[in-house]
């Protein structure tokens, strides 16, 4: 799939008439809360690591490293959740705020199944895709991850939007056309 096959802005059609079937964006309050929690955790761990009078050097170093990891994770989530996910009739992909295409998560032809049950190993407010072929590991905190044949979509995304997206993918896998 090339960028010419993907819609170039918001909802509508792109140069190759690839209509957007569904769109999922990070929910503002969930995104804000997740970032506040990660930054607060990172700051608290750093503060404890730097000011704790008792405890060994290893414990203090562990707290400092934990704080740095939490702050790095918060920044990674801030960057990742600027993107939205769109489902076209060909693929599930990222788009930035201007509608410019980013990474392709999976083509619809490469999806074997959708798992969205209560006990599915999926992100919060999301679903899990099983792919036909394994792909590289990628993690966009709060938005999606991919490991081998599995893609987890969700986190700070809006639950109704991800549910609709999962239902459309399931319908397409069953041979239906959601535009009918």
Predicted regions mapped to residue ranges:
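Short aromatic-glycine-enriched beta-strand elements
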Residues: 124-128
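Conserved beta-hairpin
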Residues: 66-115
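A membrane-cytosol interface segment of integral membrane proteins
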Residues: 129-180
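Short amphipathic alpha-helical segments, especially helix-boundary/capping motifs
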Residues: 21-22, 47-50, 65-68, 140-143
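A short, structural micro-pattern
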Residues: 86, 123, 145-147
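N-terminal membrane-targeting/pre-transmembrane regions
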Residues: 1-55, 150, 180
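Short, conserved beta-turn/loop elements at beta-strand boundaries and strand-helix junctions
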Residues: 116-120
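Hydrophobic alpha-helical transmembrane segments
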Residues: 53-67
